[in-house]
Amino acid sequence: AGIRYLRMKEAAFYNGKVGEASGMCVPFLERTNFFGDAVYDVTYALDYGLFAIGEHVERLFAGARRVGIEPPLARCELIEQVRKVVRMCDTGDLMVYMQFSGGAGRREHVRRTEAGVWIYCFPKKIEDPDKKYKLITAPDIRYGLCGVKTINLLPNVLAANAADSVGADECILCAGEIVNECAHSNVSILKEGQLVASPARGKILDGISMRRLIAACSELGVAVSRRTFTLEELKGADEVIVTSSGVPCTAAERVDGIRVGGRDGRTLARLKDMLYRQFRLACAMDRG
């Protein structure tokens, strides 16, 4: 019933204030400005239905706990507020961004303020399932809390811009010859009918879409090996798979200009079909 009153292209929330994102004001003394002192999470909405909102909020709270930020509201209260902001947008296909910051106060390293709550929703569709990604590689120069979604993303920004500058879609971050993950996605491979995915550890985010890819493999009878793998293995894989909140499952066709994958389209198609169907169903169920 509330949809008829929608009015914002991009809606935002900050500590109780709601408005068009372009007009929202955040205090100069916000700790995000000086220290990058915040954790975040991202999900998507399809026709106003949220995808896996419980899992994303749980990961956001877990990240806050890891860095000592105490959220000023409960999980259910955050989800309720996210739904309100989503409903303020004039389209229902959205990226939904949530963040807890260290709050606003005098610039000093020790936190002495209540945490800040940020929500930002803007129009964005999930990736076309038929798109084939072009990837590049770069050394992983990030710091040691990669398993926590903090906003200290300068190395990721540099990697993503390096990819964009040569017409690529993503950048694979490598520690020597070991593949970690992409600048803003997880990457895994199919080899001889088996999915090989790096274990969630300090240098790799525990991706929710990766979890769902692994669950889909289990349902479809595809074996899974959680182990590290090399760039050489990736380039020789039957398929290279990229996943993120907005990319339930897509294949890469080139890495550093070299053609990759394309040898197990049947397994890839089965996984992709299941994951996109699950995404649409989850959003429809969330709409009620």
Specify the residue positions occupied by each region the protein language model found.
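Helix-start/capping segments and mature chain N-termini
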Residues: 3-84, 109-288
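Short, acidic/charged, Gly/Pro-enriched secondary-structure junctions
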Residues: 76-106
